[in-house]
Amino acid sequence: IMTVNQDTKKILLTTTPRDAYVPIADGGNNQNDKLTHAGIYGVDASIHTLENLYGIDLNYYARLNFTSFLKLIDLLGGVDVYNDQEFTAHTNGKHYPVGNIHLDSEMALGFVRERYSLTNGDGDRGRNQQKVITAIIQKMTSAEALKNYDAIIQGLQDSVQTNMPPETMVSLVNTQLASGGKYTVTN
């Protein structure tokens, strides 16, 4: 969950473990099950499950699959993150050293998917996902990326599912271009 305050330029990322047992909304009839199983009933069931869990309204969603994630990272020219534990990913066999690392799309996908090699498993995976999301936000809100907004949207339009109207996206881009400044991202 990403909570954005445009006035203060602060973003809060909230990660819920995929294996958390929660009442699954809609088709799940509020029976407790793993959060990841909410997706069986569709995007709305996932959204309603999280809304019920946290007592919030989620205005918009963006759904990316692996292909759209790879495209996004490629369109941004990769992302830079700090990796706090060395590991080799089971998914792609790539090695991730401790320290500041640049991730191309394949490396980024392995970084956000890995859990088995990490000390705290899914918890560490969630933190790695937040690191990559933070890096994406920093790149996407930069003047350079905003000026290339059309190319990024064109590159992703067939592979990202969202309920955010295009005019809202344009308004967000224009607001960021006019106000400038970086967002502070916390978890």
Placement of each model-derived feature along the sequence:
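Non-catalytic, solvent-exposed segments at the cell envelope interface
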Residues: 2-187
